[in-house]
Amino acid sequence: MKLVAILGGGPAGAFAAERLASAGLRTVLLDEKLAWEKPCGGGLTYKAYDKYPFLLDNDTPKRLVRLTRLAASGAGAAGMRLRQPMVIYSRYELNRMLLQRAERAGAQIEQARVLSLDRAGGRWRLTTKHGALEADFCIVATGARNPLRGVGTKLTAADTMLALGYYVPQEQDHVDIQFLPNLEGYIWVFPRRGHLSVGICGRGEPARQLRTRLEAYMQEKGISWRNATFYSHVLPSLAKPAWSRNRVAGQGWLAVGDAAGLVDPITGEGLYYAIRSGDLASQVVLSEAHPPEEKPHAYRTLLNRDFAADLEFGSALAGRLFRDRCLFASVPQRMVQFMRESPRFNGVVQDLFAGTQGYVGLKARLLRNLHGTLLEIVMNFLFSRLVPGET
């Protein structure tokens, strides 16, 4: 293999470029914008920087946040001090760091939009406004709004959620997560360096309705959007049936990140899965164990074993988590209440935040802890009314 073209310079494409170039493979990355401020909270959990320590140990501006507050309408709020902090970047700074790492590794970085992609004779021909390029293999990292129809996942309206929000010139020291009635999604407030990212993501509601919900919350919390910068973006959020037909690979190409639909269908988190899929794709490209015609199958298998099967399982939970009821209240309401009353349950949520608790094993863990959790809730309920000074 002489040359790999990477179509897109976000976290997935940039990290794949670094891995391939570091291994000595000639790598060209093409992206119209390169580093830019993509609409996103910008948070990386322990799972990401434990796997890739450079995401924490670097000189790029970032915030480390340990305090998180989850709230649900009608249930109040529950605070949580994270055992492992969340690392929050502006997406411009994160993308710039990853692209610089790729360039230092030897990747050729080109600011250009790919206008067409054609395959003939086992090779690819790419055209940009600057000319044409031939490549032996392509990694598709073009994001959720992939303009190249022959490669990458095929998203339908049912397989997306909308995210919108504001960059607000204010400061706070904690993350806020707010669940709202009848919304398959949530509001977030992420503190960044010099500003807040305040946003909402949701499935099945128009942008105007989501924006109204968000601005009502901001007004209630005293967060002004008058001098803030508005943003919006479409996120992949594959429904359960879409996973079996998700198009992540084909002859001569592998898709990564949003272009492969690899986003958590419950939280909307995509950064870790972008970086991880870029890593896995580069492993498959470099592997001599798989001839070119076997690389698509090898990549699908690797994705499923690593995290895609867990995301697929999560897609079946998403609607139930946000809209179902538990003990005469919504699931988010009970979750917030249990967090306040049960250290065991709080520990489960801690691990979900850190990314160390997957969806596949969640039910079994909850059942194992059920007796202790209920006992803690009952004892806290009783003794809060018996111990002087507690309410």
Where are these regions (language model features)?
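Glycine-rich FAD pyrophosphate-binding loop
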Residues: 5, 18-40
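Nucleotide donor/acceptor-binding cores
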Residues: 2, 25, 137
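Beta1/beta-strand and adjacent pyrophosphate-binding region of the FAD-binding site
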Residues: 1-12
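A conserved beta-strand/loop capping segment in the N-terminal third of enzymes
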Residues: 44-97
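Conserved Rossmann-like nucleotide-cofactor binding loop
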Residues: 12, 35, 145
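FAD/FMN-dependent oxidoreductases across multiple families
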Residues: 116, 206-285, 289-297
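Predominantly flavin-linked oxidoreductase catalytic cores and closely associated redox partners
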Residues: 9, 101-229, 242-245, 261
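C-terminal helical "tail/cap" subdomain of flavin- and related membrane-associated enzymes
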Residues: 286-391
